[in-house]
Amino acid sequence: MAVIKEKAECCTLLVDELYGQLPARVYATLFQRGKLSVRLISQFSKLSARQVKNGLCVLQQHNLLFYSVDANSGEAEYSVNHEYAYNLVRTGKILEMVDNSYGPAGRDVMQNLLLLGQTRISDLVAAYQAKINEVNNDDAWLNDKKPELAIKSKAQLNSVLCRLIEAELIDVIHSKTFQSAHEIEKQVHREVMDVYFSNGIKGTKAKIEFEQRVAEGLRKVREESKTLKRKLAQNGGASKRRKLAVGNETNGAPEEEEDLDPALDPRQVIRINYEKCIVELRSRRLVQYVNETLGETTGYVYGQLLKQLTKNISRCKSDPLIDALTPEEKVTPSVTTNEILDKVKTSIDLTLGIGKIPSKSISKSAAERLTPLAPKDKIPFMNQDDSDDDEEDGDYSDSDEEMDTKKENGDAPVARMSRPEQLRQHLLLLAEGHPGFVRHCGEDEWTVDFKPLMENLRATELDSIIEQTSGRQGLRLIRILRTKGKLGEQALQSLSLMRKVDLQQKMLEMRLVGFAHTQEVPRDNKADPKKSIFLWYCDTEQAYSSLIAKCYATMVHCLQVLEVRRQKDKDVLSLAKRTNVKGKEKDMMRDESYARFAKFLKDERLLMAEMMRIDDTLALLQDY
Amino acid sequence: MADRDKIQILKDALYEAARDHGSDQRLFTQRDLLDMQVIPQDNIGLLMQVIQILCDEKLFVGNTTASGLSWRWRSREDAKKYTSLPNSEIMMVYAMVDEAGADGIWNRTIKNKLNMADSLMKHCIKYLEQKGYIASMKNVEHPNKKMYIKANLRPSDRATGGPWFTEGELDTAFINELQEIVFDFIKQKSTYTSHGGGAGVPGVGAQGGGAQQREKNPKKGVVQGTIPHSEDISKGTKRSAGEISNDDTAAPAPAKKTRPGKPQLLPLPAGYKSYPTVSDIAKFIHHAGITNNTTLSEADIQQLVDVLYYDGLVEPVKVNGRKGYRVTRIPKQDPRTCNQRRLDHDPTKGGIVTSFMGVEPSASGLMEAPCGRCPVYDMCEEGGPVSPSNCVYFRRWLDGDEVQEQVISI
């Protein structure tokens, strides 16, 4: 488990920010030393064992730890679950996403789960029940302004939970949840060895079989958290109908709908499934991107398509160990035009967002061209076009002429299309050209190749960062290097149409930031620097990793600045915490204090928002 | 002596025959020369004599190639220049310059190749320059080298750097101007301008039904307001594409996404066949007569478009094997041309605009935070001389705008 320093710092500070100093100190120790028992933690962190246990308890509750019991000593050893710790920063985004797709009720449940950590369903139900009772008994007739509850009944809670579980946003905790991936893998290895290969593995064939069995075992472990979902799917007769109600629960979904949901096993412990949440966030990001490149109507269509498509995608990046060997799973899901059409709101005008031109100047065959196969893994950034599609072109242009002449006869210069056809226009636009948002994989079937698409988006993000640091000329030079490979200064100069002085200055600038690098190629054994050839090149992977580190570091800085501000305004903040002041700060505090208080809140909001925005970049670079 | 006369005649005949058979770049082998049927009975000895005389008179230039000796002819004027030179040193220097052709030759190269004393070579060059046979030139690739070229030749594109150079300097102003024009051209040709205009076409809703109704009787209220188009419509098919598209989109556009009255660029449907190609752009530039004293070849324009592509401003789209270009991030593009934007730009309103082409890069959180542009980022650490807690950039970022706000509120 290698974690870069910046990430470790960031996670520790996030824990500090959310759960206080004690857990943060324990966490920092774990980051520094790796897997530790309670005794060792207390030794290294100079905390008493009791304090350490308290800290661990909080961390465990929020799923921020892995633990395993050492077979020899019988002591539990703890290590950090840094992915989960980092995901804390996405809390806001996840809540917003749930709010958008499942309404405020869904968000409320999600929020409580985030606050509580993993929770037994019965506890959650009891807590809500208490709240509902409180409001109902609290002299409802006396107090007009009783707080509006997002969840009004147990049945509704149950139904919301069912929705979220079906969407995989919530999953179940099982015995292996608290083991690190590595630990689980080791265990599965051992089991497989014991059961099938007691005599050891001999030969390549056995090796392959061994790997398959391990992958199978791992998959089984992974599936365990989906038990509730499966159960729901089994008596899922109602789920079809229910889907119609999704999103409308705010306007009081009909009671009977809720009754149809099977009661969830109250003993199950649930938690938020970040993997799936990240899938949803990725879709959001993609839609944003389409909004920028092609327009909002197309972006909306794309959003609907992704919603359909990602229903059965549980994680953004497939595990090389588990998923490599299952070709049947690899068949990417696709959606048909009609499926999308069913979901598009009737209020959306699909004629918007695309220019209207006579169909004469559109080549139908080119637009409708099918690409049934996913693109091969090409070397990223090397010149990708011009390669494979030329031979087919000849055939197409012929049939094209025919089509055009036919079109001309019917004298409607601008084709007025039916709604499905309008929708198709958006999808075709998405499918055309770079960066391949959608692949038209069959007649009226659409799919998305996430891997190359995300690779392209990553490059775009890097480009925009380069453009902001080094200007458009810097971007130009980097993109030339990316497409052409290593280049000498002369070649670079003639390709970029830049003055030698400007070019050298720009390259130097980018060399310092780490976007570009030089390589020295000596002409002879003496390696005389005067005679050596110097080549410029850019290492994109390295640029990514340095950017990722920078993102973490910037978040750390934001949190540190926030802490400094908090210290500075300590007196005001402690005043605002007093129960008689809380909620009516403006009236109770002196003007000067209130101004400081408001300023602090503003700064806090700004810094938090900034962190979320940095997370946008970071997530794109490493998680999507 | 009859023999000598005969050789004289043969010499002239062979020279003329060689001239007829190719340019002064063509190399003739012995076989080629014999096949011209000038030398009687394929007499090799005679041919040798004739060629020797031609070479002496500088009318033929000998070459050694992989397949053996060969010759090419030289014009009589040039030959005369050679023969008029006083001594062989000067002749050799002139020959070197002559060989180098339009690329020119570096004086050090002449010196090294001829193994000549410095002073002697200088003397030769001076003589030749005075005579007006050679001239010094500048090469953009090696601006510090002293180069010479035959006086009656124009330096090659490689030496001058092609159309992008003026007097050995890269003409960035010219390039930039031209880029803007090309960019505007591509923008205009690859997008659709939706005038989110106010001309109300009532009830042109989203529903397919509405659209179909329009299809049936297009005379009703489809056309955008001010100018009466009805005659045009009755003519039916004769309308231009621009007009047609106007009446169709102008109305629905303001419904949701656009602020009324503001034109907006929209992408064209997939499979659009007329995205401008490089040759389209070259034609446009040629006809517009923007570059009246330089001719730009298609390759030059390609270079220009490539730079736009590397800048992330345009992207290639392939439709039926035809590689056209369109601008990127269409909805964000400003419908005005670069020049218009420059004129409209108010420098007092702050913000240094480096380019009027395209769109600002999309904002990223990292660059917005002070750390993204921090010059001392690498040494910033809590406890160090520069740390987040004493960071001036953060202070400015968080407090700076508040100071401004207060000023405004007063």
From Swiss-Prot, chain A:
Its main location: nucleus. It is found in: Nucleus. One of its GO terms (cellular component) is RNA polymerase III complex. One of its GO terms (molecular function) is single-stranded DNA binding. GO terms for biological process: DNA-templated transcription. Keywords: DNA-directed RNA polymerase, Nucleus, Transcription, Zinc. Residues 385-403 have a biased composition (Acidic residues). Gene3D superfamilies: Winged helix-like DNA-binding domain superfamily/Winged helix DNA-binding domain. Residues 551-572 are annotated as: Leucine-zipper. Residues 229-260, 373-418 are annotated as: Disordered. Pfam families: HTH_9, POLR3C_WHD, RNA_pol_Rpc82. DNA-dependent RNA polymerase catalyzes the transcription of DNA into RNA using the four ribonucleoside triphosphates as substrates. Specific core component of RNA polymerase III which synthesizes small RNAs, such as 5S rRNA and tRNAs. Belongs to the RNA polymerase beta chain family. Component of the RNA polymerase III (Pol III) complex consisting of 17 subunits. This is DNA-directed RNA polymerase III subunit rpc-3. It comes from Neurospora crassa (strain ATCC 24698 / 74-OR23-1A / CBS 708.71 / DSM 1257 / FGSC 987).
